[in-house]
């Protein structure tokens, strides 16, 4: 029977009471759900959107925030790497906006970038969490070694105790020498070639030149213009030229950076420097060709006149130091014999050939890396939103599954708890009811009373239990 009768419920006062109760219950539910939604939204945040306090992930509906998280993920959560790739000052993830780069050569760039040989894979590590490519690489190794961490350790030479510690090797960006592709480095290089081209981060020597040399020395573009007598509006108009500039200050900056900082794979030497290279080798090894042969196994030269000059980074690693020492020597290796041949120079040659024009008519071309990143992000927005929503959960689940026996122990505990509850409780209830009947029978006539009770309650006892 209801507390309020049907007749009473027709009164507007009663209806107002109903409405008030419903409103209070709804508000109570909201006060419980809103913090839960904030917590769930927070579980999908990263450094790029950590300031967002909303009951839903902001990147679900905001393309700019999605792009910020995309750039953060692609560049391993390192803002300096983004600035070097884009060759521009950013300062904060929240300041990243839709690029306003010139898209004249964007289509050419998208057609060329899979031919570029200088890149590393992105989307694998950010803020101590493995991103999609990092998780895929770990899974590939896990399947390759059938989950045997000891077999993995023996072959790769990495002393790790758990699969949760397995991840891609650090690429050590902007070092002078390329990494030797053995062990984990080789395995990751093979894996990287199987991933989409859009996940590649291209090396940008112009950005490296700006961040490593120009920015620390001159600071603002106004100070650079004052020193060089130029009228650039930003550092994006300053390039690392293919050949040494004629301007004295520009020449000094170019030589310092190219000779001491630039990745050796981006340097080409003129064949005319062969005699100078041979003289430098003879001087370095004390005019003793046998010493040179000893340092370079497999060589059997009888004179330094037989030693070749590699015009690009030698294939043999034991020749790299000799080659670099020669480049650093201002007297032996004149700057006019050095050429920079990096991704931009390769792209400029591609554009000139594709359009059938002279190279001089298109140079220099600023690599539209930021514009390509925006295009890739927008073309894969659905996949990226799902990845950023579930990434943290996937990482935690992967950690639990591959770290100890937590899942197995939990399953065993749950099975035993449920099984014992279903088995012990009925048995205890049956035993309790039997004890009660026995006590009642004893108090009602001893063993004869027991016999009467058993006969009378033969069926009802089962129902009771």
Name the predicted role of every residue range.
Residues 40-57, 78:
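Alpha-helical transmembrane signal-anchor/signal-peptide segments
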Residues 1-44, 428, 441-460, 464:
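N-terminal signal-anchor/first transmembrane alpha helix
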Residues 10-15, 74, 395-403, 436-440, ...:
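Helix-boundary and loop/linker segments of multi-pass membrane transporters
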Residues 2-9, 388-400:
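A short amphipathic helical element positioned immediately N-terminal to and/or at the very start
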Residues 402-414, 452, 456, 460-465:
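Loop-to-helix entry region at the N-terminal start of transmembrane alpha-helices
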Residues 401-434:
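Transmembrane alpha-helix signature in integral membrane proteins
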Residues 54-395:
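Polysaccharide-binding and catalytic clefts of secreted carbohydrate-active enzymes
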